[in-house]
Curated annotation (Swiss-Prot):
One record GO biological process: lipoprotein localization to outer membrane
Function comment: Plays a critical role in the incorporation of lipoproteins in the outer membrane after they are released by the LolA protein.
Keyword entries, A-Z: Cell outer membrane, Chaperone, Lipoprotein, Membrane, Palmitate, Protein transport, Signal, Transport
NCBIfam families xref list: lolB
Signal sequence region: 1-24
Superkingdom, taxonomy of origin: Bacteria
Quaternary context: Monomer.
Protein's organism: Shewanella sediminis (strain HAW-EB3)
Chaperone in keyword set: yes
Protein name according to UniProt: Outer-membrane lipoprotein LolB
Length: 218
C-alpha cells in the first residue's frame, strides 16, 4: 500500500529546472540552533536542508518539497506538497522512529523498516544524511571519482544495492556539497535537488564573535 499516492504529481523535469525558494510555511530549525559557516560539511554539528525529491517507479512518478534537520542523535524529515501542505513527517531520536502520514502516527525502532512498511517505499533514510553531504558510509563502494576527488558514483554492498550518482556540486554555508543526486534500486528511482543547506551550531556552543546567517535570508 502506498499512502503517499495523493501527492501532487508533476513532470520530473520541473524538479531539475526549479530554482525558487520553498513556500513561506517551510519548517524552521529548532530555536536552540544557530546558522553558522563551516569549511567542510564534516565540521557541522548539525544541519538543515531544503530541496526537492522526485520519485519514479515502474507505475508512478511524482515530486515533493523536502526538508531535513539532522544532528548526530536526531533526524526530522518532512515532505510537503507544492502548496506547502505536510503529507509526511518522519522523526528519529536515539533508536526510536515516529512517522506521521495521512493523519495517522506510526512508531518503530527502525526508521527504514517503518517507512517501508507504511508507505511501501524502501528509501535509504539511514544513509541519506551522508549522501546528501557528499560522503560515503563504511558499507559503500566508491565506483567513480571526478578530477577533484569527489565521489561521482557509489554502490551499497547490501542487496539489492543502491547506486548513487552525484550529478552536480555547489557551495553552501561555506562548504562544498552535492546539488543534485540520483539514486537507483531495482525499479525505484529517486532524484534529490538540494536548494539550500545550512550548517547549524548549538547556541550555547557558538563563539561570541561567530556571525549568524539565517537560511531564509540566503
Amino acid at each position: 500500500m502506498n499512502n503517499l499516492s495523493y501527492l501532487t504529481k508533476i513532470p520530473l523535469i520541473w524538479v531539475l529546472l526549479s530554482v525558487t525558494l520553498l513556500s513561506a510555511c517551510s519548517v524552521a530549525p529548532p530555536e536552540n540552533f544557530i546558522p553558522v559557516q563551516v569549511d567542510d560539511v564534516s565540521n557541522a554539528q548539525a544541519w538543515e536542508m531544503q530541496g526537492k525529491l522526485a520519485v519514479r517507479t515502474s507505475k508512478d512518478k511524482f515530486s515533493t518539497n523536502l526538508y531535513w534537520f539532522h544532528t548526530d542523535k536526531k533526524n526530522e524529515l518532512t515532505l510537503t506538497t507544492m502548496l506547502g501542505t505536510t503529507v509526511l513527517s518522519l522523526t528519529t531520536l536515539e533508536g526510536e522512529a515516529r512517522l506521521e502520514v495521512d493523519g495517522k502516527v506510526y512508531q518503530d525502532k527502525d526508521a527504514q523498516r517503518l517507512l517501508t512498511r507504511v508507505t511501501g517505499w524502501s528509501i535509504p533514510v539511514d544513509a541519506l544524511p551522508l549522501w546528501i553531504t557528499g560522503r560515503l558510509s563504511d558499507d559503500d563502494e566508491l565506483l567513480v571519482q571526478d578530477e577533484q576527488q569527489r565521489p561521482m558514483k557509489l554502490a551499497t554492498q547490501n542487496p539489492p544495492p543502491w547506486e548513487v550518482e552525484f550529478i552536480s556540486w555547489q557551495q553552501q554555508s561555506g562548504a562544498e556539497l552535492p546539488r543534485l543526486l540520483q539514486l537507483k534500486r531495482e525499479d525505484l528511482r529517486l532524484k534529490i535537488q538540494i536548494s539550500h543547506w545550512q550548517a547549524l551550531s548549538a547556541a550555547h556552543l557558538l563563539p561570541s564573535n561567530q556571525p549568524e546567517e539565517r537560511l531564509n535570508e540566503q
